[in-house]
């Protein structure tokens, strides 16, 4: 059983934007099989625009995990959409806070039950997530 730490989960605000962009881009660049093969200048230019596009949608939501007593300290986030279908775009938890159940709690806060959902960014941790969430389907075209 994984150890848990007390966190609060809140909606993101504009003060969180740099954290979200930097962690999403840097982490995805080095945690995906195919992005490692893209030259950094090409990846950061184009994927930054993709992330900005996702965040700018009316249907996009971002939740932030913080220590319960430190609302300005970000431990991680999840970006998702709930519309005709549930779409998970990205989950990030700072490495030193992984294996405390933060990602799982963000996922359940955002996506609810284990009903059918899609995800758009394949990273190495998704390999284990697919086993835990069998109704999760990779669909990069929902970006």
Model-derived regions, located:
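Conserved GNAT acetyl-CoA-binding A-motif
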Residues: 85-90, 112-143
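Flexible, charged surface loops at secondary-structure boundaries
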Residues: 54-59, 81, 112-114
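Helix-loop element at the rim of GNAT/NAT acetyltransferase active sites that forms part
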Residues: 23-39
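Alpha-helical elements of Rossmann-like donor-binding domains used by nucleotide-donor carbohydrate transfer enzymes
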Residues: 19-23, 49, 105, 109
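Conserved acetyl-CoA-binding loop-helix of GNAT-fold acetyltransferases
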Residues: 93-113
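A short beta-loop-alpha structural element at the N-terminal edge
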Residues: 6-22
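Active-site rim helix/loop that mediates acceptor-substrate recognition in acyltransferases
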Residues: 37-69
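Conserved beta-strand in the GNAT
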Residues: 62-64, 71-82, 87-92
């Amino acid at each position: 059983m994984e150890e848990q730490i007390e966190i609060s989960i809140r909606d993101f605000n504009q003060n969180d934007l740099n954290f979200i962009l930097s962690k999403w881009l840097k982490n995805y660049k080095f945690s995906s099989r195919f992005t490692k093969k893209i030259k950094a200048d090409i990846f950061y230019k184009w994927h930054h625009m993709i992330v900005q596009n996702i965040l700018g949608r009316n249907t996009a939501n971002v939740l932030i995990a913080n220590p319960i007593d430190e609302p300005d300290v970000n431990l991680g986030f999840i970006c998702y959409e709930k519309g005709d279908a549930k779409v998970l775009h990205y989950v990030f938890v700072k490495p030193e806070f992984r294996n405390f159940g933060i990602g799982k709690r963000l996922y359940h806060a955002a996506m609810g039950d284990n009903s059918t959902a899609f995800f758009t960014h394949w990273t190495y941790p998704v390999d284990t997530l697919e086993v835990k969430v069998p109704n999760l389907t990779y669909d990069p075209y929902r970006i």
